[in-house]
C-alpha cells in the first residue's frame, strides 16, 4: 500500500516537473511540421543524457529541429559539417599562437556547445569521428596539456545520409554503440507536405523564444531518474535484450542464423533510461510495457549485427526487433 502512495506522490510531482515539456513540444510544433518521432527522440535524448544518430535523406528538418530545441532552451548550438579534410582540431579546438600576447592560447572548437549537430558524420575519417565520440563519452576534451569540461546539458545529434555511401567512412560498431538512439527519419505525409509548402512560400518562419532553461533541464534529468520501474518491467527489458543474443530461448529459432551479435548490457541500460524518459514525456511517474516498446526500435536497431545470410535475405535489424517485441512475453 505504501508503494502505491509513493507512486501517486511521484505521479503528482512528475506532472508538475514535466509541465515544461508541453511548452517545448508546442514550440517545436510551431516551427516543424510533423516529424513527431524526431521531436520525441530529441526530448528522450535530452532528458536521459544520451546522444542520437539520425538517418534520413537531406531536407527532413534535422538541422532545424535541433536548432529550434536549443533556442527554446536558451542554450548554445553549433553545427559541424563533416568532410574528408576535417581534422580533430576542427572539432575539439587547438592551441594558436597570439602575437599580441606572445604565447599560445586555447581556441575552443564547435564541440563546446549544449547542442551539437554533427552533420554527415560518416564523411570524415575515423580519427575525427573518434575525437567527437570521445568527447561524447567523457564529457570533456583535452587541448594541449589542458582538460576542459563540456557544457551541461550536452547533446550530440549526428546525421547520416543512407543514400550516398561513396567516399564515406562508416562508423565502427563499437562507436555506433555509444549513441543511445538511432532514429530513422521518414518523409512527411501528404497533408504535412502541403502545410510545409504553404508556410514556406507565404510567410516568415515563426519566431522562437525560450520557454525553459538549461538548469531546468538538469533538474528534470534528476526527476527522470526517479521514474519508477517495476521489477517485472526490468525483467521485460532484460528479456528483450537477451532475445537479441539467444533468440532460440524465446521461440525464435529462425533468427539464430540471422544475428551475428546481439545487444550489450549498454542496450539494457539505454532501454531502461529511454523508457523512463518516455514515461516522463507522457507525464507519468512509472514505466509501462508500452514505453519500452515505443523506444525499443531506436535503442536496438544499431546494436544488432546481421549475418551474411540475413543480408542476402534482405532481413533488417528493424524486422528482427519487431519479431522480438512481438514474441517476448509482456508483463
Region locations from a protein language model:
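Walker A/P-loop
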Residues: 46-83
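Conserved alpha-helical scaffold flanking the Walker A/P-loop in AAA+ ATPase domains
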Residues: 41-44, 97-117, 146
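Pre-Walker A (pre-P-loop) alpha-helix and adjacent loop at the N terminus of AAA/AAA+ ATPase modules
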Residues: 13-60, 242
Amino acid at each position: 500500500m505504501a508503494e502505491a502512495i509513493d507512486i501517486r506522490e511521484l505521479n503528482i510531482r512528475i506532472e508538475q516537473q514535466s509541465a515544461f515539456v508541453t511548452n517545448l513540444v508546442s514550440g517545436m510544433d510551431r516551427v516543424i511540421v510533423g516529424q513527431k518521432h524526431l521531436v520525441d527522440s530529441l526530448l528522450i535524448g535530452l532528458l536521459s543524457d544520451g546522444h542520437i544518430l539520425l538517418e534520413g535523406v537531406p531536407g527532413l528538418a534535422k538541422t532545424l529541429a535541433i536548432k529550434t530545441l536549443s533556442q527554446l532552451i536558451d542554450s548554445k548550438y553549433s553545427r559541424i559539417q563533416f568532410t574528408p579534410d576535417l581534422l580533430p582540431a576542427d572539432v575539439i579546438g587547438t592551441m594558436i599562437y597570439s602575437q599580441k600576447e606572445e604565447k599560445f592560447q586555447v581556441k575552443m572548437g564547435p564541440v563546446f556547445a549544449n547542442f551539437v549537430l554533427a552533420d554527415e558524420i560518416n564523411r570524415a575519417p575515423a580519427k575525427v569521428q573518434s575525437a567527437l565520440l570521445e568527447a561524447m563519452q567523457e564529457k570533456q576534451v583535452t587541448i594541449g596539456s589542458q582538460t576542459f569540461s563540456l557544457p551541461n546539458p550536452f547533446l550530440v545529434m549526428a546525421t547520416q545520409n543512407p543514400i550516398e555511401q561513396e567516399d564515406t567512412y562508416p562508423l565502427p560498431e563499437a562507436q555506433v554503440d555509444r549513441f543511445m538512439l538511432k532514429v530513422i527519419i521518414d518523409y512527411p505525409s501528404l497533408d504535412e507536405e502541403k502545410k510545409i509548402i504553404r508556410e514556406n512560400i507565404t510567410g516568415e518562419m515563426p519566431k522562437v523564444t525560450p520557454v525553459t532553461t538549461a538548469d531546468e533541464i538538469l533538474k528534470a534529468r534528476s526527476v527522470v531518474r526517479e521514474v519508477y520501474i517495476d521489477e517485472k518491467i526490468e525483467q521485460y527489458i532484460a528479456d528483450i535484450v537477451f532475445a537479441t543474443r539467444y533468440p532460440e530461448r524465446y521461440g525464435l529459432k529462425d533468427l539464430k542464423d540471422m544475428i551475428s551479435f546481439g545487444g550489450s548490457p549498454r542496450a539494457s541500460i539505454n532501454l531502461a533510461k529511454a523508457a523512463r524518459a518516455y514515461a516522463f514525456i507522457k507525464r507519468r511517474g512509472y514505466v509501462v510495457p508500452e514505453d519500452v516498446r515505443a523506444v525499443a526500435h531506436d535503442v536496438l536497431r544499431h546494436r544488432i549485427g546481421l549475418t551474411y545470410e540475413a543480408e542476402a535475405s534482405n532481413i533488417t535489424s528493424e524486422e528482427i526487433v519487431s519479431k522480438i517485441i512481438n514474441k517476448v512475453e509482456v508483463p
